[in-house]
Amino acid sequence: MDALNSREQQEFQRVVEQKQMKDFMRLYSNLVERCFSDCVNDFTSSKLTSKEQTCIMRCSEKFLKHSERVGQRFQEQNAALNQSMGR
């Protein structure tokens, strides 16, 4: 980053922020699709049943914890790789 001028740093930051937003939207979309498919089975009412609500809460918590754990492992692997390369 130090080798970039101010304009290049701003452009780099913009690209990083766009990628982060895209990744967040993909995560959210996957969460909604998976939990809805797994938990919502009754389409006779426009409201969720208490069983469906509970299922969605558990599903989303589990999904987010899993995503967080994967992110942590990725950071650990990246740090180990950087350390082994002498960075």
From Swiss-Prot:
Disulphide bond pairs: 35-59, 39-55
Subcellular location field: Mitochondrion inner membrane
Alphabetical list of Pfam families matching this protein: zf-Tim10_DDP (PF02953)
Gene Ontology MF terms in the entry: metal ion binding; protein transporter activity; unfolded protein binding
SUPFAM superfamilies: Tim10-like
Keyword Disulfide bond: yes
Leader peptide range in chain numbering: none
Family the UniProt entry places it in: Belongs to the small Tim family.
Record text on subunit structure and interactions: Heterohexamer; composed of 3 copies of TIM9 and 3 copies of TIM10, named soluble 70 kDa complex. Associates with the TIM22 complex, whose core is composed of TIM22 and TIM54. Interacts with the transmembrane regions of multi-pass transmembrane proteins in transit.
Function: Mitochondrial intermembrane chaperone that participates in the import and insertion of multi-pass transmembrane proteins into the mitochondrial inner membrane. Also required for the transfer of beta-barrel precursors from the TOM complex to the sorting and assembly machinery (SAM complex) of the outer membrane. Acts as a chaperone-like protein that protects the hydrophobic precursors from aggregation and guide them through the mitochondrial intermembrane space.
PANTHER family cross-referenced by the UniProt entry: MITOCHONDRIAL IMPORT INNER MEMBRANE TRANSLOCASE SUBUNIT TIM9B
Name recorded for this polypeptide: Mitochondrial import inner membrane translocase subunit TIM9
Species, as recorded: Eremothecium gossypii (strain ATCC 10895 / CBS 109.51 / FGSC 9923 / NRRL Y-1056) (Yeast)
Gene expressing this chain: TIM9
